[in-house]
């Protein structure tokens, strides 16, 4: 059970919450702050004070005063009218993350909701009732209005949820769990939907997958180094310390550890003086991607604990301030950066695939074919990798450079952060498939070189891979092989655990 405080949530805790289904509870001290802040809202309504989103309309309607008797209707109307999401739903892990992050931001005690609302969000998390939230429709400012409105709907007994493996109406799940839908009161609708929790939840899942995929890329690249009898000198510690990037040094160190007892690597001058960049520069390229990952993790952990709705209430109600913390620009930039960093792992992987299959670049059978000419072997696998890499290049175009004004030009600059976050996740799926192709080719090359000559780590990884796909002894439908390895990487390593050298042993 993980305790939410509004201030201390980490990526490691989110892994447990999203991927292992761990439950959550609220810190009592934080809940007391929620209750105290709610008293301020009640006084504002009772006194008829003009405060945006509490006693006024929204967006362009911020100058329209709302009568006391209409305050509840205002919040309900807000949720229904803003539930304009379209397209396929987010993965359940993302909608679960949205519930968690929305509760966590409310626990900062500046949003003005009742403790009841926070408790309802936590009930959904702990009972694994996950809102069906369409992926498209958010501009990323005023936060993720459309996606979060679909989240808010289910608290009211409206909309759909994923529950016990099925997609059902929210009331089906609520009834079975013995829960009553809530009725929103002043400010609560706005507090539920004004924030960055859709882009951030998707960003967290993307980061978790990206981190493990980056570790996998090092292990798979190490197998390729063996298959091509790569020069180990390029990974010498002195080379990488001379440049000074810690991530580059760490990648080189892990590859040295992976290959320390390999009989397939060579020294410079034995077979050739230098390797191609796709081998020699693995620490420089992969290390740079790790720099991106470290940056993204830092920004996500800030946003996970941020107050992102509007207005915010401070100093016991002395200050009720309209601001713009809902603007998703920090996450938009981070997700666009993640797209580029991960796309490069696929770019360099595809070049290693080419070196494994091109007979002009190695002494292996052409296209790793068991009978070149009659059988094409891995020829079209390289085509598939090239296609995925090119698709990533289009997806990597920064969403954050775009902005379209909305709400009659009141909201005249937006982040497009949710688009960036969604595209980052798509890129990571493509990267994993490219790496799967590289692994298939590297395993085949290892067989030609002699499996007994592989390092202890890569040999273990090879045997695990061969449990998923057989050797290429004849042409067959290779798309099945690619998907099998992709699924195996994702379910056994990618989002379940951090892969280090010992994980393959």
From Swiss-Prot:
It is found in: Cytoplasm. Pathway: Amino-acid degradation; L-histidine degradation into L-glutamate; N-formimidoyl-L-glutamate from L-histidine: step 1/3. There is a cross-link at residues 141-143 (5-imidazolinone (Ala-Gly)). It is an enzyme of class 4 (lyase). GO terms for biological process: L-histidine catabolic process to glutamate and formamide; L-histidine catabolic process to glutamate and formate. Keywords: Cytoplasm, Histidine metabolism, Lyase. Its EC number is 4.3.1.3. One of its GO terms (molecular function) is histidine ammonia-lyase activity. CDD domains: PAL-HAL. It comes from the Bacteria. GO terms for cellular component: cytoplasm. Its main location: cytoplasm. This is Histidine ammonia-lyase. Belongs to the PAL/histidase family. It catalyses: L-histidine = trans-urocanate + NH4(+). It comes from Bacillus cereus (strain AH820). The modification 2,3-didehydroalanine (Ser) is found at residue 142.
């Amino acid at each position: 059970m993980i305790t939410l405080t509004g201030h201390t949530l980490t990526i490691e805790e989110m892994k447990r919450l999203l991927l292992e289904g761990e439950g959550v509870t609220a810190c009592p001290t934080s809940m007391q702050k929620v209750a105290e802040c709610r008293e301020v809202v009640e006084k504002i309504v009772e006194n008829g004070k003009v405060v945006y989103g509490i006693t006024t309309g929204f967006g362009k309607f911020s100058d329209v005063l709302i009568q006391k008797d209409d305050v509840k209707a205002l919040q309900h109307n807000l949720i229904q009218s803003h539930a304009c999401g379209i397209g396929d739903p987010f993965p359940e892990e993302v909608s679960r993350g949205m519930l968690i992050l929305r509760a966590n931001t409310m626990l900062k005690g500046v949003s003005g909701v009742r403790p009841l609302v926070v408790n309802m969000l936590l009930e959904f998390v702990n009972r694994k009732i996950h809102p069906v939230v369409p992926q498209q429709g958010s501009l990323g400012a005023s936060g993720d209005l459309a996606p979060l409105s679909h989240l808010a709907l289910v608290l009211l007994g409206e909309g759909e949820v994923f529950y016990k493996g099925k997609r059902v109406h929210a009331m089906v799940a609520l009834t079975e769990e013995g829960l009553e839908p809530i009725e929103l009161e002043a400010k609560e609708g706005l507090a539920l939907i004004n924030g960055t929790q859709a882009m951030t939840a998707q960003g967290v899942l993307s980061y978790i997958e990206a981190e493990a995929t980056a570790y996998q890329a090092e292990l798979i690249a190490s197998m390729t180094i063996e298959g091509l009898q790569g020069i180990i000198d390029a990974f010498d510690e002195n080379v990488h310390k001379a440049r000074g990037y810690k991530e580059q040094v760490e990648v080189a160190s892990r590859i040295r550890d992976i290959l320390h007892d390999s009989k397939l690597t060579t020294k410079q001058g034995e077979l050739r003086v230098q390797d191609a960049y796709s081998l020699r520069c693995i620490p420089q390229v992969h290390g740079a991607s790790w720099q991106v990952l470290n940056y993204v993790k830092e920004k996500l952990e800030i946003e996970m604990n941020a107050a992102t709705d509007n207005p915010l209430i401070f100093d016991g109600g002395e200050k009720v301030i309209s601001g713009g913390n809902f603007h998703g620009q920090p996450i938009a930039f981070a997700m666009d950066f993640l797209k580029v960093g991960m796309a490069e792992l696929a770019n360099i992987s595809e070049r290693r695939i080419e070196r494994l299959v091109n007979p002009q670049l190695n002494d292996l059978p052409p296209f790793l074919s068991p009978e070149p000419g009659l059988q094409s072997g891995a020829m079209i696998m390289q085509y598939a990798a090239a296609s995925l890499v090119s698709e990533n290049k289009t997806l990597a175009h920064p969403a954050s450079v775009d902005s379209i004004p909305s709400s009659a030009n009141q909201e005249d600059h937006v982040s497009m952060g949710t688009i960036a976050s969604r595209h980052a996740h798509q890129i990571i799926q493509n990267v994993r498939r490219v790496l799967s192709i590289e692994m298939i080719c590297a395993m085949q090359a290892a067989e030609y070189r002699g499996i007994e000559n592989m390092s202890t780590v890569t040999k273990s990884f090879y045997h695990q891979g061969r449990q998923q796909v057989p050797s290429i002894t004849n042409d067959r439908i290779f798309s099945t092989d690619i998907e099998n390895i992709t699924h195996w990487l994702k379910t056994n390593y990618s989002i379940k655990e951090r892969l280090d050298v010992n994980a393959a042993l």
